[in-house]
Amino acid sequence: MANLDAPITYLFVPADRPERFAKALASGADRVIIDLEDAVTAKNKTAGRDAVTSADLDWSRVIIRINDVTSSDFESDVSALRRLPVQTIMVPKADGQTCLQRVDDAFDNARTLIPQIENVKSLFALPEILSAPYVDRVAFGHLDFALDLGSGTDHEALAHVRSQIVLQSRLAGKPQPIDSVTVDFRDPELAEADARFSRKLGFGGKIL
């Protein structure tokens, strides 16, 4: 059953573009995801962390997407973010409880996690991912998933994957999952069509 009070729209903003933070928070999106991962180049990772630590943010509406736990930037993210009142962390390429437990431990078991399902391994690990008490809900990352699977990125190619994410979330008693981003975000008709498709499948929110 849908939670009418749950966030529906999630807006990405690169961590190294602090001039966009306030605009994103004023955009009307329910949540703003400040991204330290794919949206920030390797040479700008430190600048991105510095921008987040120095920003005046409404942490009740901000989610931080950290770098993959296997990357060299993960520990630097933890070091920078641990002293901030971050409430929710998005975990890319989450592939099981070991990965998530590492994040939970690094942040002293005091944050809510949103794991991203971005490869086949993470799809088949959904039962253990969703059973973790610190997991709020999961989010789909269709571009990385299609790359891992070797499939197309269109609705038809990944409908079966989306359905599995929705079904497993319902079975685990978790809130409806968050669907992936619309690549051409400047096309409002495409974004609306994507959102309608996501809703039809049972997703409760979408990344913009």
Locate the predicted segments by residue.
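Expand to "…catalyze enediolate/carbanion chemistry for C-C bond making/breaking, isomerization
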Residues: 1-208
